[in-house]
UniProtKB/Swiss-Prot annotation:
An annotated GO cellular component: phenylalanine-tRNA ligase complex
GO molecular function, one term: magnesium ion binding
Pfam families reported for this sequence: B3_4, B5, tRNA_synthFbeta
Binding site for Mg(2+): 324, 330, 333-334
Keyword Nucleotide-binding: yes
Domain B5: 270-346
Family as reported in the entry's similarity comment: Belongs to the phenylalanyl-tRNA synthetase beta subunit family. Type 2 subfamily.
Annotated organism of origin: Methanosarcina mazei (strain ATCC BAA-159 / DSM 3647 / Goe1 / Go1 / JCM 11833 / OCM 88)
GO biological process annotation, one example: phenylalanyl-tRNA aminoacylation
Protein name from the UniProt record: Phenylalanine--tRNA ligase beta subunit
The entry's keywords: Aminoacyl-tRNA synthetase, ATP-binding, Cytoplasm, Ligase, Magnesium, Metal-binding, Nucleotide-binding, Protein biosynthesis
Major enzyme class: ligase
Cofactor(s) it depends on: Mg(2+)
Length: 545
């Protein structure tokens, strides 16, 4: 989860109260205090609230929670003066584009850092490390509209941010620190995305690097913001950035986006989403019957627009920067936060039952202890995944035991995983900026034929990772679990031929281990050797071993 540094001077000015009150109350909106220093506080906000990833967003939420300013924030948007056209050839590379202009911003070194931190935290929280969303922030004074979002040849040259000489896009991907880190996001394409002004000056090479011409300084007052990506999350990210800048006094201005075929979008779209919420829904989730007036009050404290239609129904307007409101349950959660969990009455169950540890928990304890003892860190990725990750990236054939999501909201979460290893490789891909070796494991759920099972899987990445290393780990794990086993030659296509083996217990295949083959490593954009194993422990749960 992102840790946001909030400087007291900025925080008190934007919130309108003292730091002691803020530090005392901010955990109640969904945050953990990490560190309290003389000049600043580090706060870890939950990943479902990217609108809190900045001092401006946190202050906006706290003003409501402290009853200093309640209800739906209103942002005036000026008519557009800037337009940008989208070319046909970019649609197969990075098809979604959101843009806005914000004028009259007064920057200091700390507010620039806050904006850049928000940008990077959104890249992580909404953007899947820039894959789904990448954000460019530009000084508008050095470029000339209208702008163009298009694809160009890899030999196209410009001066990238923090450099003084021109480089081709190919050279940027090979030599620039940002280029080498994010080159995999544009690999496989014959052309690369670019945003140009009317005089062919470069604003951005998304999702890699901006041009140096539009770098933001303390003298910058007017900004052009571009957000590119693979889906509609770009519009949410845009709304979060522009409303944060508006909280600091900036004036938002529409941008006209002209798409191929003449379709036009006028962005940002800050119109709130409207929902209907009933008192019955609230009672069913928090266990208390709150009057409609109390529900309206608490929703307004949490910065929603709310109006009672009758004694049982509330019309709720959801701010356009709230990425986490997917269901009415999310509204009820915010009502509970506003009302105060400490104020929700405890109800003692009328019947007595004796509790005991679940068999899965009894299995989890020794598994975790063994893997941690072997030097691995536990991770907990999502059970939802996609066919691409679960099968294609692993070079495995699609199976017919898959449970699919009926109406997925993301192409990354269309099915329940049938194996754990791909999720671990995704985590390695997201942590390439950290030092090696990296060793991670998970004891978690998989679903096959609508039946839930428990697997343990682990991966290790570093230049010297080999079959011997993973064999020793599997052997140690099986011995510590007091399981007699044998290994046989494996034909699992995810692993390198001759460096893979299946694990059998009592004649039944339990799992597989070995060196991941180069094609798998490449598909997850990993640059070093990876070894791993996965074992099905379902038949062992509840048994004495």
């Amino acid at each position: 989860m992102p840790v946001i540094t909030l400087h007291y001077e900025d925080l008190e000015k934007l919130t309108g109260t003292d730091k002691e009150t803020i530090i005392k109350r901010v955990p109640m909106i969904g945050a953990d205090i990490e560190r309290v220093e003389d000049e600043y506080v580090d706060i870890e906000f939950f990943p479902d609230r990217p609108d809190l990833y900045s001092v401006e967003g946190a202050a906006r939420a706290m003003r409501g929670f402290l009853d200093l300013e309640t209800g739906l924030p209103e942002y005036e948007i000026k008519p557009y003066k800037v337009s940008i056209s989208v070319s046909e050839d970019i649609l197969k590379i990075r098809p979604f584009l959101g843009c806005a202009v914000v004028r009259g911003v007064k920057f200091t070194s700390s507010s620039i850092k806050s904006l850049m931190d928000l940008q990077e935290d959104l890249h992580w929280g909404l953007g899947r490390n820039r894959k789904k969303v990448s954000i460019g922030v530009h000084d508008l004074k050095n470029v000339k509209p209208p702008f163009r979002y298009m694809a160009v040849d890899p030999g196209f040259e410009f001066v990238p941010l923090d450099y003084t000489e021109k480089m081709s896009m190919t050279e940027i991907l090979e030599k620039h620190p940002k280029g080498t880190r994010f080159a995999h996001l544009v690999s496989g394409f014959e052309k690369y995305p670019i945003i140009l002004d009317a005089d062919d000056n470069v604003l951005s090479f998304p999702p890699i690097i901006n041009g140096t011409l539009t770098s933001v300084t303390e003298e910058t007052t007017d900004l052009f913001i571009d957000v590119t990506g693979l889906g509609e999350a770009v519009y949410t990210a845009l709304n979060i950035v522009v409303t944060a800048l508006a909280e600091r006094g900036g004036e938002i201005e529409f941008v006209r986006v002209i798409r191929p075929g003449g379709e036009e979008l006028v962005l940002p779209d800050l119109e709130p989403e409207e929902r209907l919420l009933t008192t019955g829904e609230v009672k069913s989730l928090i266990g208390m019957e709150l009057p409609v007036e109390e529900i309206v009050k608490q929703l307004e404290r949490m910065r929603f627009g709310a109006c009672a239609l009758d004694k049982e129904t509330v019309e709720v307007r959801v701010p356009a920067y709230r990425a986490d409101i997917l269901h009415n349950y999310d509204l009820v959660e915010d009502i509970a936060k506003g009302y105060g969990y400490e104020n929700i009455k405890v109800k003692i169950p009328e019947t007595y039952t004796a509790g005991m540890s679940h068999p899965i928990s009894l299995m989890r304890a020794p598994v975790n202890e063994i893997m941690v003892g072997l030097g691995y860190y536990e991770v907990m990725p999502f059970t939802l995944t996609s066919e691409k990750v679960n099968f294609e990236n692993m070079c495995r054939e699609k199976t017919d035991d898959v449970t699919y999501v009926l109406h997925p909201i993301s192409e990354d979460q269309t099915m329940l995983r049938t194996t754990v290893l791909p999720n671990l490789l995704e985590i390695l891909a997201l942590n390439q900026h950290r030092e090696l070796p990296q060793k991670i494991f998970e004891f978690g759920e998989v679903v096959s034929n609508e039946t839930t099972g428990q697997h343990v899987a682990a991966v290790s990445i570093h230049p010297q990772a080999n079959f011997t290393e993973v064999y020793e780990v599997v052997d140690a794990f099986m011995r510590e679990m007091m399981l007699s086993y044998e290994v046989k030659e494996s034909k699992d296509p995810a692993f390198l031929e001759g460096r893979r083996a299946d694990v059998y217990v009592n004649g039944k295949k339990l799992g597989v281990f070995g060196e991941l083959q180069p094609e798998v490593i490449s598909k997850f954009s990993l640059g070093y050797a990876v070894v791993g194993f996965e074992l099905d422990l379902n038949d062992l749960i509840g048994k004495n071993i």
